[in-house]
Amino acid sequence: MAKFTKSLVLCLLLAAFVGAFGAELSEADKANVVNEIAANIQREILKGVKSSETTLTMFLKEMQLKGLPTCGETCFGGTCNTPGCSCSSWPICTRNGLPKRAGVKSSETTLTMFLKEMQLKGLPTCGETCFGGTCNTPGCTCDPWPICTRDGLPSAAA
């Protein structure tokens, strides 16, 4: 958010500069300045999106390694290539046993970091992951999996 604010202030300062000295600039120069401002703002926004994608990818990869029931592959010929996975709920490979507890704290930290970042960006997350296709938080659904999301817009109390 701080980067966006800085970009906005920079944009306003450049716009004020162009407005103040606009009479001395040609139309081509004005267009170049405006295009440069737009490109800078777009770059800042895309940096934030890339950060969110990286955090989500890291979270999902860690969850797969720490014991979420899916193995990250589909059944092929009735078998799964990932060790510890089986094709019992075709077409998705699932783990044979309960998740190991060794990495739970690390996974919770990653989940908390991901959810905090998403909430700061305004996504309606509920603060839990889907378990058995359901969410325990009232008003939340398991769509899109694996993050529970609110059915509608978040209420002011949430």
UniProtKB/Swiss-Prot annotation:
Cleavable signal peptide: 1-22
Q: Where is this cross-link: Cyclopeptide (Gly-Asn)?
A: 67-96
Sorted alphabetically, the keyword list is: Cytolysis, Disulfide bond, Hemolysis, Knottin, Plant defense, Repeat, Signal
Crosslink position(s): Cyclopeptide (Gly-Asp): 122-151
Which cysteines form disulfides? 71-85, 75-87, 80-93, 126-140, 130-142, 135-148
Q: Name one GO biological process term.
A: defense response
Hydrolase in keyword set: no
Top-level division of the source organism's lineage:
Eukaryota
Propeptide positions: the record gives 23-66, 97-121, 152-158
A Pfam family: Cyclotide
InterPro entries given in the database record: Cyclotide, Cyclotide_moebius_CS, Cyclotide_sf
The record describes its post-translational modification as: Kalata-B3 and kalata-B6 are cyclic peptides.
- Give the protein's biological function: Probably participates in a plant defense mechanism. Has hemolytic activity.
Q: Which family does it belong to?
A: Belongs to the cyclotide family. Moebius subfamily.
Q: What is known of its domains?
A: The presence of a 'disulfide through disulfide knot' structurally defines this protein as a knottin.
Q: What is this protein called?
A: Kalata-B3/B6
Organism of derivation = Oldenlandia affinis
Instruction: Give the source lineage, highest ranks first.
Output: Eukaryota, Viridiplantae, Streptophyta, Embryophyta, Tracheophyta
Question: What gene codes for this chain?
Answer: OAK2
